[in-house]
Amino acid sequence: MKKNRFTYGLALGALGIVFGDIGTSPLYALKVTLSGIPINQFNILGVLSLIFWSLIIVVSFKYLMIIFRADNDGEGGILALLALMKHKSTKYQPVFYIVAIFGAGLLLGDGMLTPAISVVSAVEGLGTLSDKLYPYVLPIASLILVLLFSLQAKGTARIGYLFGPLILIWFITIAILGILQILEHPVVLKAINPYYAIAFLVDEGLRGYFLLGGIFLVVTGGEALFADIGHFGKNPIRFSWFFIALPCLLLNYFGQGANLIVRPEEISNPFFMIAPPWFYLPLIIIATVATVIASQAVISATFSLTKQAVLLGLCPKIPIVQTSMLHSGQIYVPQINFILFIGTMAFCLAFKTSDNLAHAYGIAVNLEMLLVDAMVAYAAVSIWRWSTFNVIFLFGLFLLIDLAFLGANTHKFITGGWVPIVLAFFIAFIMYSWRYGLEYLRDNFYMNKEDISKILKQLQYKSLNQLPGVSAIFITDVYDKSGGSFLHFLKLNRSVPENVLIVNYIVDNIPYVHYSQRYEIVCLDEKVCKLVIHYGFMETINIPRSLEKACNKNILPFKFNVDTATFMVEIPNIMASKEKRSLSFYWQEKLFAFLMRNYSANLNIEFYKLPYNRTIAIGTYCIL
């Protein structure tokens, strides 16, 4: 389902969701970068030149022109990229699998830091009104974040349409503030010349190199452009960037620089200081609204990433709540929301100011960009069939830039940047253990089972006691291709329903599955059929709804009413064994067993959208 259409409505929507993070970077990026060095014209022009060319090369060229080509049938993001690699059956799948799940973990860590630094930096504008208000910055920011996370369960369907216009107001506001300063001191326009960036780095030496860690803050949020392709399409995102976001950001950065050339003492808060005093309070309100929207976009993106991971079988079936009946992409993941809330509040309370938060922010995003570069470079060779020379030249440049930023960000590891990285390793390990455990179950407990059709013959199926008028639907999980729930039912009961449907779902490596490819059916007996339902990794799995559509289209050889049928699911009870080694480590087996016990029964029923009052769980026992 490729999304190349363009409308101004989509462009406005993209402005509100895609550019919230990168659009609020002027609140803190220039202040953090220039802190600790002399505030003079040479240094300001050098830093502005680095900002200008970073936005042009990293965001405008690398992401919007090159990385955008690596979409998976219109969907972007690191997990969609992983699915694309799997779809092409590359021999390096295991490597990219590890890379992708680590990258997903990094994005979750970023989802903790972005709301913290964005909201705190906006509320710090209160200090421009009065020094006496500084002590209230952290409590107010914390209150805003508490409200933000507590309202996630309500969804954004009612107010989401306002995000685009509100962020547009934000961009227009910061652009006007920048223009007013540039008109007074147009000398800052010299920074467009890359000479000033090079001269600054040469003159500052090692100190100048480490200042790239601050420069990188202006491109954080650039990864959201690729991740949100599926929501708005490539062309609306490109339009919003080149005609609104990029010009407004540059005007504001250059405006801050122009003001600092003549008023270097205002480095304490250069963003708010370019506004006239009478506009401080309105600007604080606008900035706070913009940062809340930016935070909401990051939280929603994390929810979407989690849903992709669940559907691709990379993590357990944690509860996913649909918050809108009209838009399938509007979801709420309670457990992820709680983790993000705890992490965000911990960062706020531990670091207290945007300056301190900036010393931890960026390294996780930097690593994620580096991983995406590597995956897209391989896609360019193996899928796009680019020449090796062109790939080495182009992506060598990208990797060199990202590695340069990463080197400059390394000092952030010990000042708080280690938290999202350690979290990423932990999440990646959980995903790896879950995936490896499912593969072990499939290969050792289910793959060796005898074919159902043979078992039916051995049991003399037609001679079994029939339950006339009863229809039963047996749901089998992704690791079970043999119909385990049905076989266990036969063992426990020597009677069978009149109509039996064994349902297995498969999540394909594409975002959406066309109706013509949705169903596969195999008749095992006159009244026993096996149905495979295909879903895309961006779709919501709803077994009853899919079955109802199949009945309406007369796909099944027998008639039954989905609203009265009984559903059967198999719940494996996994036990770890010290004597028998299945996974790499005993504690890894314990982790997998814990996840299976806590994310199987009720969550399977919720995941498949099965009716609780007509669903029976059948237990089975597996020793690893």
From Swiss-Prot:
Compartments it resides in: Cell inner membrane
Transmembrane segments: 10-30, 48-68, 94-114, 133-153, 159-179, 210-230, 242-262, 270-290, 331-351, 363-383, 388-408, 413-433
One cellular-component annotation, GO: plasma membrane
Membrane topology qualifier: Multi-pass membrane protein
InterPro entries to which the protein is assigned, alphabetical: K+_transporter, K_trans_C, K_trans_N, Kup
Catalytic activity: K(+)(in) + H(+)(in) = K(+)(out) + H(+)(out)
Keywords, alphabetical: Cell inner membrane, Cell membrane, Ion transport, Membrane, Potassium, Potassium transport, Symport, Transmembrane, Transmembrane helix, Transport
HAMAP family recorded: Kup (MF_01522)
Cited function: Transport of potassium into the cell. Likely operates as a K(+):H(+) symporter.
Identification of the protein by name: Probable potassium transport system protein Kup 1
Species in which this protein is naturally found: Legionella pneumophila (strain Paris)
Gene field: kup1
